[in-house]
Amino acid sequence: MGNKEKEENKKVMRKNILTSMFLATAMGVSAQTQQVTVVELHPAPGQFVNTLPEATAETTHEEVCEAATESLADEELIHLGTYGGYITVQFDHPVQNKKGSDFRILGNGFYAASDPVYGSETIGGSFEPGIVYVGVGDDVNTCKWYELAGSEYYTSEIHDFSITYHKPTAESGDHKQPFSTFDNYIKWEATWTAKDGTKRDSTGYHMKNSFHKQTYWPLWEEGETLTFKGGKLPNNAIDQSGKGSYWVLYRYAKDAYGYADASLNKDQYSTFDIDWAVDEQGNHVELTEINYIKVVTGIFQYCGWLGETSTEVAGFVDLHLVPGYDDDPIIIPVKQRPTGVASVRADGKDDVRYYDLTGRRVVNPTRGIYISNGKKIMIK
């Protein structure tokens, strides 16, 4: 089949999908399915932008959402780009909040075949966590959004990260970095508040690598800048080679939960509980059902020749439509909001993880205040 015929078939398929959705709405059809519709797709710049799904200079936002809807129906990847890029989907019905996890998000995370430090016990590989939000309301533009508080929410997540990317003025340029075709390709400017209350800011560039030659700027977006604001997760990549040739992207812990593309698709940790919803102050919110699901790339990290860390999604599953699921639902233990400062001695040897007040992991904590298991800990 030629490219022209393939494109015509795609157009027919898109028309059929939209026609079916319209007829179902007009006739009041109430059948619930696992079909999701992409209502927003706004990736940040990234090396697979405009290819997952494909887009050209003539592509509109509506058309790229239709293409993404088709991709998800086939469990094909949607690329969200670097930090802040997002996708919003809805099922043909509200997702109910029942006992245990309520939905699953498919990604492309996997464990490393060879971890030089942790070997077969590794929790590292290629994991690119995305923060998940749920929306309640009839219109995606006016609905109320709530973040699902994952395992890092009360400890190491930054909650007011803001970044602006500038549209590149050229697609090639000066380059000295390995595998780069343009070192100063995408300019960015970021601001945030550190855990100790210090206001921070930074400016830099993302390079364009030699493996992906198309523009990394989403072609359907208007304007010269893209700005994203929200939560930011701690970086998770380690250059295990020490030379930039072997990067391992780790899960935050074996029982880390609450993030898309941050575990294997078959794991319980790729499922999400609406009960994790919190408001902007981090307070628990009671929701009976949700209308929209948004996934946002949660890490701002660049890994040499691997490029930017980007969340990818490949599907969404309403677990309550899976036969027999509600009889034995997945229940994930969650970390509670810190309520005070506990006291421990510094000479204890255990597997507890400690973080300083900026969210950085501390391997050998000395005297001071740290965050551990969702609580502030004072080591004497």
Go through the PLM ranges and name each one.
Residues 332-358:
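Residue-level detector of functionally pivotal "anchor" positions at catalytic/ligand-binding pockets or at interdomain
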Residues 136-140:
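Short loop/turn segments immediately following beta-strands, especially the blade-tip
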